UniProtKB/Swiss-Prot annotation:
Protein name (record): Small ribosomal subunit protein uS14
Cofactor comment text: Binds 1 zinc ion per subunit.
Keyword Cytoplasm: yes
Keyword Zinc attached: yes
Description of how the protein assembles with itself and partners: Component of the 40S small ribosomal subunit.
Lineage, broadest ranks: Eukaryota, Metazoa, Ecdysozoa, Arthropoda, Hexapoda
Main location: cytoplasm
Protein's organism: Bombyx mori (Silk moth)
Length: 56
């Protein structure tokens, strides 16, 4: 049994390891509110396209 078979073989059904950004597959800084499931970097990039507006 090599390293490739063991690495990431544990099932990820819940927790931070089970979710990733739908745009870039990043697992850090994930925004899950309203079912967005995108990381904060991608949110800044696509927020205007999604329909979010910056308030003064």
């Amino acid at each position: 049994m090599g390293h490739a078979n063991i690495w990431y073989s544990h099932p990820r059904r819940y927790g931070q390891g089970s979710r990733s950004c739908r745009s870039c597959s990043n697992r850090h800084g994930l925004i899950r509110k309203y079912g967005l499931n995108i990381c904060r970097q991608c949110f800044r990039e696509y927020a205007h396209d999604i329909g979010f507006k910056k308030l003064d």
